[in-house]
Amino acid sequence: MEEALVKRIMPNSLEAEQSVIGSMIMDKDAIVTAMEMLISEDFYHTQYGILFDTMIELYNKGLPVDLVTLQNKLKEKDVPPEIASLEFVRDLVTAVPTSANVKYYAQIVKDNSMRRKLIKLNEEIENECYVGKESVETVMDITEKKVFDLLSTRGGGGDYVPVSYTHLRAHET
């Protein structure tokens, strides 16, 4: 019986990644929502991870996050010109009809990131089993630890939340 060859592409959604970034440019509240859920490594397409980190950096410094400041900061960071171009950044804003759905877009990005991490973890476990140097018990222990570590990252990008924002949240409750 022949197995069908399946072209495997790592899980990702270009549209969701673009929508998260576009929403963050459009709305300061979307920045907070996105940074609570994501880290730059969650983006499959590197350019959006770079934009994400740059916007978080601007936001954490209390600077406006708009087309001009973002483009200027990207140029300072010496990123590739295609990422720092005004057209590239502006196209992200025009691609998003509303920032109201940023949480949904961010969840898609996060889910795909977790899928990629699970695939990588599965490959590591598979390789351990094929190599056969460790006992089954040791491989099981390593697997359990790695799965637990992965589960602990589900919460998102809490590392980016500024102290002032945390302080405000504490007073709201």
Task: Label each residue range with its predicted role.
Residues M1-N112:
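Noncatalytic partner-interaction/assembly domains of nucleic-acid and motor enzyme complexes
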Residues E3, K133-V136, G157-G158:
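Conserved catalytic-core motifs characterized by acidic clusters
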Residues E15-E17, E144, E172:
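Acidic-residue sensor for enzyme active/binding pockets
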Residues L86-I142, S152:
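Extended, charged alpha-helical coiled-coil/arm scaffolds that mediate oligomerization and mechanical coupling
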Residues K145-Y165:
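Charged, amphipathic alpha-helical linker segments immediately N-terminal to NTP-binding catalytic cores
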Residues T166-T173:
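Conserved small/polar residues in nucleotide/adenosyl-binding loops
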